[in-house]
Amino acid sequence: MSTPTLTLSEDRLLPRESSALAAAREIYRSTKGLPIISPHGHVPVSWIADDMAFSDPTSLLITHDHYVNRLLHANGVDLEDLGVGRKTMSEEDNRRAFRILCEHWRDFAGTAMRYWLVDQLVGIFGITDRPSPENADRIYDTIAERIAQPDFRPRALMDSF
């Protein structure tokens, strides 16, 4: 059985009505290369200011994203299991938290968090397998490998966008 995949549609945030879609595509085409200036983010600002390498997939995608950890908590997950309020987590704790995210993937259906996570998985990390308990460790390892590379440091990523 093949693993369900994730994809990114160029039209994913555009209206569906045909005349509006054509106009939106033109606006997007003419502006997509411009920089985004936004004070909003879900990682500690010191990571960007100090250009610190991301330590692990869990702290990057789960622990510091209050939307993600609140949705998981609303579905019965203890915040401490996601690293919230903890100063340190072991490698196994980080993997366990990432497995929890993958086990609860269905709970993100129809949410902005799902959109953001898919955009990050596919668009930044090149991961097209839909997260599940069966592939959680493989996805974790792929992200961990990528964030260890200089091209995935915070400022390098910002420059790439």
Regions found by a protein language model. Give the residues of each.
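Metal-cofactor-binding active-site regions of metalloenzymes
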Residues: 2-35, 41-161
